[in-house]
Amino acid sequence: MVDHKRIPKQVIVGVSGGIAAYKACTVVRQLTEASHRVRVIPTESALRFVGAATFEALSGEPVCTDVFADVPAVPHVHLGQQADLVVVAPATADLLARAAAGRADDLLTATLLTARCPVLFAPAMHTEMWLHPATVDNVATLRRRGAVVLEPATGRLTGADSGAGRLPEAEEITTLAQLLLERHDALPYDLAGRKLLVTAGGTREPIDPVRFIGNRSSGKQGYAVARVAAQRGADVTLIAGHTAGLVDPAGVEVVHVSSAQQLADAVSKHAPTADVLVMAAAVADFRPAQVATAKIKKGVEGPPTIELLRNDDVLAGVVRARAHGQLPNMRAIVGFAAETGDANGDVLFHARAKLRRKGCDLLVVNAVGEGRAFEVDSNDGWLLASDGTESALQHGSKTLMASRIVDAIVTFLAGCSS
């Protein structure tokens, strides 16, 4: 039986002429290492920053530069027709303008017109150019036509400038590229005007200056939800506990915390303005009653006894606050449950009980175990709703899982509005 998910995809990487063109090399390398066939189409100005030989060495494929290089092959038609995905990184203000206008004055823009696959633009330009009304209109036009235009990162630009307009990290671009290949369609821009509050990662409760109580959460699933929601138009705030060295998603406000109390305080601060809470963080249930100011020594009397106190349930607290009218904007509350079966019942038995106990609108359920849920890049599980409906979340990347979760949130919000 053929595993279609493992069949290499045809990916075109378009590179336009900006200083960030050198970062396209990492995008090409990562997509190639993911076993995709990558064809690079640089603009003439892009080749002034990075030579064709570099792209050919990284992709293992000849670089395509000229509509007339192989006239019988009609490259400006066939490249777009055969592609499973087109990624343009970096996409300059000029490239976005030409794409929005439907220009076909070079091989890259001509290929964009013939492509029938998802198209992903990763913009890079100075802040003033990104915020200019012309660029804003061009981006809106491309999104309206179904293209995915990433929000640029904020940081150091060329020269001494700093601000919004920096090319998103290569990992960000390739992660979303892989999602588009898994979804087989573009990401809808359907969360514009919505504010999402997402928590991710694990908390740490200090025992002494060296030791802490923690858990195995990597934060990958929560980060993926924040990333996907932002690229679907949401205004996202991500409250991040300890993670596996993850790159902060572009276009997302990230608040870093350590302990359960810090996370609870951050949620209390940001929840009043949020439409949706996605509680993906693994929050410690207990904390030491006292934190030692010096490292606890082994001693000769045996291991020390540590008295524990129960932490407040952050998710249940938000549900109560909404019920008491304290969160009038909150339309959807999404919880997460990492469960194992036991003598009393299976994973879903415990998950259904948790949904009733917590009172959230949606509950994402993962069965945990060796090589499952924690510290891995893929996931599966179930999605339970407060109305009793249940659906399976088929195995896939955590980014694909995030996309399905966001799909469910959009559907739930539509039901609230009807």
From Swiss-Prot:
Pfam families: DFP, Flavoprotein. Homododecamer. This is Coenzyme A biosynthesis bifunctional protein CoaBC. GO terms for molecular function: FMN binding; metal ion binding; phosphopantothenate--cysteine ligase activity; phosphopantothenoylcysteine decarboxylase activity. PANTHER family: HOMO-OLIGOMERIC FLAVIN CONTAINING CYS DECARBOXYLASE FAMILY, PHOSPHOPANTOTHENOYLCYSTEINE DECARBOXYLASE. GO terms for cellular component: phosphopantothenoylcysteine decarboxylase complex; plasma membrane. Keywords: Decarboxylase, Flavoprotein, FMN, Ligase, Lyase, Magnesium, Metal-binding, Multifunctional enzyme. Disruption phenotype: Transcriptional silencing of this gene leads to growth attenuation and results in a bactericidal phenotype in vitro and in vivo, whether initiated at infection or during either the acute or chronic stages of infection. Pathway: Cofactor biosynthesis; coenzyme A biosynthesis; CoA from (R)-pantothenate: step 2/5; Cofactor biosynthesis; coenzyme A biosynthesis; CoA from (R)-pantothenate: step 3/5. Residues 1-195 are annotated as: Phosphopantothenoylcysteine decarboxylase. CTP binds at residues 285, 295, 336, 354, 358. InterPro entries: CoaB-like_sf, CoaBC, DNA/pantothenate-metab_flavo_C, Flavin_trans-like, Flavoprotein.
